[in-house]
Swiss-Prot record:
Record bears the keyword Phosphoprotein: yes
Protein name (database record): Acyl carrier protein
GO cellular component, one term: cytosol
PANTHER family: ACYL CARRIER PROTEIN, CARRIER DOMAIN-CONTAINING PROTEIN
Gene Ontology terms: biological process: lipid A biosynthetic process
Amino acid sequence: MSDVAEKVKKIIVDQLGVSADEVKPEASFVEDLGADSLDLTELIMAMEEEFEVEIADEDAQKILKVQDAIAYIEEKK
């Protein structure tokens, strides 16, 4: 797992209070990890801060799964 993937996974575990075992690349933030809209906003903000990137609102709406977040951050770095 890449450094970005590890950091994204840690952010998700910290923000959503889920176990690391639940955070799989194909996991949906809402359906599999139980996130609501506020959780998603906080996740995006935490990722922006950790990776020093800005995630546009229209891009944030497309980040639905763990792998989407990892791929987006890797592309922006």
